[in-house]
Curated annotation (Swiss-Prot):
Residue runs in coiled coils: none
Superkingdom per UniProt: Eukaryota
Protein name: Protein SLM6
Transmembrane intervals: 77-97, 105-125
Extracellular side: 1-76, 126-150
Disulfide bonding pattern of the chain: none
C-alpha cells in the first residue's frame, strides 16, 4: 500500500504501521503542544510587554525542537531559526499598530506558534524528500530514514 505514494514525505506521514514514521509524527505533535503551551502561558500575562511575550514563545519553541537537532539535519535547524526570528519580527511590528496591548500579545504569541509549527512541517517534508535514496521501497513501505529515528 505504501509503495503507491511517490512522495517520501507522504509515505512517511500516511503509513502509520511504520514505527519510525509514527515516532516522527508523535515527536512533531509533542513539539507543537509544547510551543502552544508556551504561547498560551505568555499570552495570559497581559501586563507584560509584547516583545517579552514573543521572545518567551520564541525561546520555548527553540527548546522544543530537540528532535530536529538530534536528527542531524543542520539546514532544518537553520530554517527553523530563520522562520522563528522572522515570525518574531513580524509579530512585534503589529504591536505598534495595535491599541490593545492584551490583544496584541495574544495575536503575537499565536503568530509565532503558527510560524514555528509550519516550519516544522516544511522541514520534515523537505528532509524526507531529500533522504529519499535512504528509504527502502519494499512491500511494507518501510520508511527507515534517519530523520524519524529518536
Amino acid at each position: 500500500m505504501c509503495s503507491r505514494f511517490s512522495s517520501t514525505s507522504l509515505k512517511c506521514l500516511l503509513c502509520s504501521q511504520n514505527r519510525h514514521c509514527s515516532s516522527g509524527i508523535s515527536t512533531l505533535l509533542r513539539s507543537f503542544s509544547c510551543i502552544t503551551l508556551s504561547a498560551i502561558s505568555s499570552s495570559v500575562n497581559c501586563s507584560g510587554s509584547s516583545f517579552l511575550g514573543s521572545s518567551f514563545s520564541l525561546f520555548s519553541s527553540f527548546s522544543c525542537k530537540e528532535s530536529l537537532l538530534r536528527s542531524g539535519v543542520f539546514p532544518s535547524w537553520l530554517f527553523c531559526m530563520f522562520s522563528s526570528i522572522l515570525a518574531l519580527a513580524i509579530s512585534n511590528s503589529f504591536f505598534f499598530f495595535s491599541s490593545n496591548a492584551c490583544f496584541s500579545l495574544l495575536f503575537n504569541s499565536f503568530l509565532v506558534t503558527g510560524f514555528s509549527f509550519s516550519a516544522d512541517l516544511l522541514v520534515l517534508a523537505a528532509a524526507a524528500d531529500t533522504l529519499e535514496s535512504n528509504v527502502s521501497n519494499d512491500i511494507g513501505g518501510n520508511c527507515a530514514t534517519r530523520l524519524f529515528k529518536l
